[in-house]
Amino acid sequence: MALLDVNALVALAWDSHIHHARIREWFTANATLGWATCPLTEAGFVRVSTNPKVLPSAIGIADARRVLVALRAVGGHRFLADDVSLVDDDVPLIVGYRQVTDAHLLTLARRRGVRLVTFDAGVFTLAQQRPKTPVELLTIL
């Protein structure tokens, strides 16, 4: 089972995303093993999908929610409930604002026994604080 971070989820949905081909390749090979979203990644997906400064083909909130519903209908999906607080003792040490979401997702993945799939090398580095947190860092082939 793999939890896709926001960037991986956005890349999966939008063919204009720079990493779309890579995540589709990964998804084709891995989706049947199970893939997941959580409240944080779903909210991030809607936020990014509706922001024209981030996504040139941005859509409205209702449309972004419909796309999310369609993604969740793809086989192997599981929604992970989220009970992480950033003040919990098992959250990696956060030293900068760009690590807040990463630390949250890493903690959720570890608690649920899933790996976190990301394109962000910084997440991989942060995960080294907790060696039992599996992270799959996708690279462009």
From Swiss-Prot:
Does the keyword section mention Magnesium?
Answer: yes
Q: Which GO terms describe its biological process?
A: negative regulation of growth
- Record carries keyword Secreted: yes
> What are the UniProt keywords, alphabetically?
Hydrolase, Magnesium, Metal-binding, Nuclease, Secreted, Toxin-antitoxin system
- The record lists Mg(2+) as bound by D5, D102
Q: What Pfam families does the entry give?
A: PIN
Enzyme nomenclature, EC number: 3.1.-.-
Chief location of this protein within or outside the cell? secreted
Task: Quote a single Gene Ontology cellular component term.
Answer: extracellular region
Q: Which cofactor does it need?
A: Mg(2+)
Q: Where in the cell is it found?
A: Secreted
Catalytic EC class? hydrolase
Molecular function (GO) terms for this protein are: magnesium ion binding; RNA nuclease activity
Which superkingdom is the protein from? Answer: Bacteria
Recorded family membership? Belongs to the PINc/VapC protein family.
General function of this protein: Toxic component of a type II toxin-antitoxin (TA) system. An RNase. Its cognate antitoxin is VapB38.
Tell me the protein's name.
Answer: Ribonuclease VapC38
Designated gene of the protein: vapC38
